[in-house]
UniProtKB/Swiss-Prot annotation:
Disulfide bridge partners, by residue number: none
Encoding gene per record: cep41
Disruption phenotype: Embryos display peripheral heart edema and tail defects along with ciliopathy-related phenotypes, including hydrocephalus, abnormal ear otolith formation and smaller eyes.
One Gene Ontology term from the biological process aspect of the record: protein polyglutamylation
Organism: Danio rerio (Zebrafish)
Entry similarity comment: Belongs to the CEP41 family.
Role this protein plays: Required during ciliogenesis for tubulin glutamylation in cilium. Probably acts by participating in the transport of tubulin polyglutamylases between the basal body and the cilium.
Taxon lineage: Eukaryota, Metazoa, Chordata, Craniata, Vertebrata
Entry protein name: Centrosomal protein of 41 kDa
Amino acid sequence: MSVKRGIGDSAFLKKKIPQNPKYQHVKTRLDTGSSLTKYMERLEEARKNYRYRKDELFKRLKVTTFAQLVIQVASVSDQNDNIKDEMAGLEDDVSIFSASPGLDCLSDQTNGSPQPNLPPPQTINIDESGDNGFSPRSTLQSVISGVGELDLDKNGQKTIRLSPVSTSNTTECPYPDCPYLLLDVRDRELYDQCHIVSAYSYPIATLSRTMNPYTKEVLDYKNASGKIIIVYDEDERIASQAATTMCERGFENLFMLSGGLKVVAQKFPEGMTTGSVPISCLPSPTGPAGRKRSAQHQTSQLAEKKWRFTAEDLDKIQHYLEEVFIPSETSSRLSSRMSTSSARSKASTVGSSRQGSSIAGSESARSRSSRPWK
C-alpha cells in the first residue's frame, strides 16, 4: 500500500525569510511578549556591558537606580538650602530691627490712636565740626533709607553693611550629608578627561599603599549607617578588582556601579557626566546618523570640577529616566487611541450632518433606506 502524503512540500515551513542587512537595526514596535529573540538580546547586552561573576563579594548598583538617588539627593539639598536662606533672612531682619532704636519710638507713636501734636524734628550736633543732622528717633528718614543699609557717617554712626549669602560657595562644595560617596578608581588623567559629577578621584593604586591607603572621605563613609560607597570605571575591569579588595578589608556598604561609564554614556548621554566621554564608552555607530554622532564626540574637552548637578542636568537625567522606564509602545498606543478618537468624532459629526439633511428631505431618505448600504 502507498503511504498518503500531504499536499505541498514538508520543507516549506522551514524555509527562512531572506533578510536585508540594511534594515537589521530597525526594531519592531509591536510588543509580542517574551520571546527567544528578546532573551538572546538581553544576554548579548549583558555580555557586552557587564561582567558578572559567580563569586562576587560586592553588591551591584544599577545606573538607573543611581540616577534616581541623584535626583532625590539634589531635591532634598535644594529644600534644605531654601530653608537655610529663609532662616538667614529672618536673622538679618531681626538684626536690622535691633540695630535701629528709632523704630521702637515709631511703633509707640503709631500703635495706638493717632497723636495730632508731634514734636518738631530736633537737630542734634554729633560731629565735632558742628554739622546739624536729623535724629533717627524723631523722623522717618531712618525707616525710608533703611537703618543698617545706608552709610550713616553723617550722624556719627558706623556703617552696618549686610553681606548677602554667596551661593557660589554652596555650588562648588559637595552635597552636605550626602548618603553616597562616588569613587572613580581609574587613573587621574582619565578622571580629568571625563567623570561623573560629584565623583572623587581614587585610583586603584591607592589601595596598594602601606601607609594611608584610604582618604578622609573613605574613612568617614566606611560602614557608616545610612551611607554607601560606590566605585566605578569604564567597563568594570578595574572597579571589580577594587570592590573585591575593599570588601575583603571590611567594607560592608560597598557597591559597584554596573556597566560603569559605558552604560552611563548609553542611557544618559547628557547631564550625568562632565567632560568628553571616552571613545571606548560610546555606542557603536549604526548608519550615517551614528557616524555623525561619533564625529561630534571626537572633540576632546576637559572635565569641570563639578560637585553638584545643575537644574538643567537634573532635567536631562529625568528625561532619560522616563525614556528608560516608559516603553516606546505606549506612545504608539496613545497615538493610535488619539487617531481612533478623532475618527470617531469625525464620524459623529458626519452622522449628525446626515441626520439634519435626512430631516429636511424625509421622503427621499425613506426611499433610500430600503436600498442596501454600500
